[in-house]
A protein has these predicted regions:
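Accessory terminal alpha-helical modules
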Residues: 1-366
Length: 366
């Protein structure tokens, strides 16, 4: 460029309010960028380039609609973390005049001819572009972008690796607990305080329970089982009737599983319950949910009578009927087919002749 960055601000550079910082001995900048400029700043043309010559993964188109809809459906409370980008070109920070040359607040100028690479956030960037097509007035809202000076392909690849390898996805239970926007999740969380066996006995953060824990169930297990009960695959707001039948179902299950009553009476610990019996495991809860759905569908008038037979079920781990269904060589089995088969076993114990669509699971196993 024939002119300095400052001289060409109006026509040849982007300018942003920014904060300057130092990390690992290198300067970086956090800038506030209008959403409408994000698609212009960052473009993608790496699809045909071999992975070893790229510094980011290929964009997954399947992820974009969900993120776009999240923005559009929550215009008053969506939130995005910062994008992280490398600038291959001229970039200069000018501190605010009142702060002197060492000032941390100022303006960041980036030459328009620079190549900007997103190290973290390319799916958010694409979703923003798609959302703006439907709602362009959101273009004046801001997102923070962390800018680093590009130090070559190897460094950019390392940045991508470092930013992603230590990221830990929240557990399913924690997502349910914290998702106040999702009505189904909120209902399930409320269940944990409404149903006596669940109260103070549900692991709300993890999807597994440690051997010495006082918890007997997991939040994700109750959520999955409730979806099986209602026959829904995606979370949605439940009708008042669905909510009531769910509460009624779980209360009856508690009433007719004798070991759960021992737990309520303090005659057995949660640890011993999990150690000696199968009915606190997520797969067992799912099987119970399926049982409830079948009973309510096939016996709408007297399903409550049928469910009383749960008290006749031998839930102990030593019961050979659970082998290949909830257990494999004595260890809990994590298998969708096993859940269906366990549901069949419980249904038969409840005096139900298996419907044709249930028999097929036995045939597959046979």
């Amino acid at each position: 460029m024939s002119r300095t960055v400052e001289q060409s601000v109006s026509s040849e550079t982007y300018g942003f309010d920014a904060i300057r910082g130092t990390q690992a001995g290198n300067e970086f900048y956090v800038a506030m960028c209008p959403l409408k400029i994000i698609p212009k700043l960052f473009s993608f043309n790496d699809h045909d380039i071999p992975p070893q010559l790229r510094a980011q993964r290929v964009l997954s188109a399947a992820r974009i609609p969900a993120i776009k809809n999240y923005i559009l459906n929550n215009p008053n409370d969506y939130i995005f973390s910062s994008l992280t980008a490398s600038v291959d070109g001229v970039m200069k920070f000018t501190p605010a005049a009142s702060l002197g040359e060492e000032g941390k607040l100022g303006r960041l100028y980036i030459a328009m001819e620079s190549r900007l690479l997103i190290n973290d956030g390319q799916h958010r960037r694409k979703a923003i572009e798609e959302a703006l097509k439907e709602k362009p007035d959101m273009g004046h809202e801001m997102i923070s972008v962390v800018f680093f000076q590009d130090s070559g392909l190897k460094r950019s690849q390392q940045m991508f690796s470092d930013l992603n390898k230590n990221a830990v996805k929240p557990t399913k239970s924690l997502n349910i607990l914290y998702d106040h926007r999702d009505k189904f999740s909120k209902f399930v969380v409320d269940l944990t305080s409404e149903i006596n066996i669940f109260k103070d006995r549900v692991e709300l953060e993890k999807t597994t329970i440690s051997n010495r824990s006082k918890k007997a169930f997991t939040l994700n297990g109750i959520s999955d089982a409730t979806r099986h009960l209602l026959g829904i695959t995606k979370n949605r707001k439940l009708t008042s009737e669905e909510q009531e039948i769910t509460r009624e179902f779980w209360k009856l299950v508690v009433k007719y599983i004798s070991e759960w009553n021992l737990l309520l009476e303090g005659k057995i610990s949660s640890a011993d319950l999990r150690k000696e019996f199968v009915h606190g495991n997520t797969n067992s809860l799912n099987a119970l949910g399926i049982v409830g759905r079948v009973l309510i569908k096939e016996y709408p008038e007297d399903w409550k009578e049928k469910i009383k037979r749960l008290r006749d079920v031998d839930w102990s781990r030593t019961n050979p009927e659970w082998e290949g269904r909830l257990l494999l060589n004595g260890r809990m089995l994590k298998n969708a087919v096993g859940v269906e088969l366990a549901a069949n076993t419980i249904l038969q114990k409840c005096g139900v002749e298996l419907p044709e669509d249930r028999v097929k699971h036995e045939n597959k196993n046979g």
